[in-house]
Amino acid sequence: MSKFIVAGITQLETIVKVKEIPIKYEPYTGERDSIYISAGGDAFNESLALKWLGDEVEFMTVVGENEDLSIFNPANRKVTLSTEYVLPIIKETPKEILLYDARRKAQRFEDLKDIRDADYNMMLVDPLVPKCDMMVLSNVNFCRPFIARAVDNNKKLAVKIHSFKRDKEIYNEDFLKNANILYFNDNSIDEEPYEFVKEMAGKYDPEIIILGQGENGAIIYDKNKDFTVHYDAVNTKQVVNNAGAGNALFACFLHYYLKTADSKLSIHKALLFASNKIGYMGTSNGFMTEEQLEQWDNLIWNPRGAR
């Protein structure tokens, strides 16, 4: 069991199943079980995934001043997250609408409200940092002070870059330069994947880079073992909704990497973990325990054969 501090964006999500992306205009569409509303966002999804895997998690985020925190722990879910460090200090909780179709294409509409103006109370964070094994951050403004805490306490820092864009790269340099592990999603990157990973590795010198590629799998770079490898996605369930798959993959990778220091084994486990996740509606559903994941692994593969 590892101890994580996870800080970043949490939002309320409305997920809508549509016939195809891009959508065609129709004045009315009625379809049963096609709209799902829940809590989501990088920090929430990653915290929940790590908790399912058996880790200790300090979940740190900001929400609207009138938000009902019970939305983070619905009664029918076995695993709960502490909301002790969920601070209601912004006017409204960020919102997202996600449209998706059967081909795994998706279209997002995001409204981060006034989260860019939030200031997290770091006095709550400081006593917890020495006890954690890793800090996991979103590249949002209120997470910037967390970087120095990780560096000063010699803690591993993992950062999921939310919607990477070249014209915004300069604003993310403090995250990029200090992270031991970086995660990008290719849905906002219009560059040759291997060249992008190579450039990020040379420019920022992280230990690990993961480039999530959706239905095409992932590319992983490991500085210490000197390789850059593509892994295909794993298909174990019918795809219901691929939203949150990147969060699931990232969290599971971090869980196993801290445990084993083996990036190949960790990405292998993470791809399997994500494949189960996308068989469920909602970004925060479909997670497995470590025991369940190992059982799936033994049924599907010989783990040594994946290295």
Language model region names:
Residues 2-12, 75-87, 99-229, 261, ...:
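Ribokinase/PfkB-type carbohydrate-kinase core domain
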Residues 1-60, 69-70, 281, 307:
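Glycine-rich phosphate/adenosyl-contacting loop at the front of the ribokinase-like
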Residues 34-41, 92, 240, 244, ...:
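Residues at secondary-structure transition points
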Residues 4, 197-307:
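Conserved phosphate-binding/catalytic region of the ribokinase-like
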Residues 62-64:
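Alpha-helical transmembrane segments within multi-pass membrane transporters and channels
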